[in-house]
Amino acid sequence: MKKVLFVLTSHGEKGNRGSTGYHLGEVSHPWKVFHDAGVEMDFISPKGGEPPVDGFDLEDPTNLEFWNHPVYKEKRIHTKKPKDIIPSDYSAIYFAGGHGTMWDFPDNTELQELTKTIYESGGIVGAVCHGPSALVNVKLSNGSKLIAGKRVNGFSNEEEAIVKLEGVVPFLLENQLIAAGGKYSKSAPWNTHVEVDERLVTGQNPQSARAVGESILSLLKK
């Protein structure tokens, strides 16, 4: 089985509302699913190097295991840049969430190209929470949007309002996923919700991260 490519945000500021970054649990819980199954992972971020982290909770044993794992500690501290990646080495690309993604994922053409290439080569595209912001502008070789006509999921407008950041983020993800042609659905705030449409796997919130990993793993085993 080929590797899974994790993508983490490099953006560390939440407007004027303090720091942000990738959400630790949205990395650690899918990581645990893949690691326990013997799947190797690599990590990239738009700028490379050590990305900023949010949701830093080492009382979560999965977070703690990931944070201290000697191999993956090196990989998360020294993330590669998109240009360093050979797409054919990967069977899936996974976009972890965290509010930072809303600033540096949507318009990153290198990430769009990686996503398109992996998907059109038969690979899986996964994302959770704000991670699907990476997908709103991805176009396939035929010019159509990757998510057009597909069932998708991501952080809801209601959840953004609950955390009082609807006026801080550059756009509302739910609205943008719909505008890109996605068939968006959601559950009540903070409930696990995952949509699987062929080789596209998206989850609504941090609570959905493990289930997204499990859904990707199921597809990898087919």
Regions found by a protein language model. Give the residues of each.
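Extended, subdomain-level signal for the structured scaffold at the beginning of enzyme domains
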Residues: 1-121, 133-222
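Conserved, well-structured core segments that form or line functional sites
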Residues: 125-126
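Alpha-helical segment proximal to the catalytic Tyr-Lys
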Residues: 129
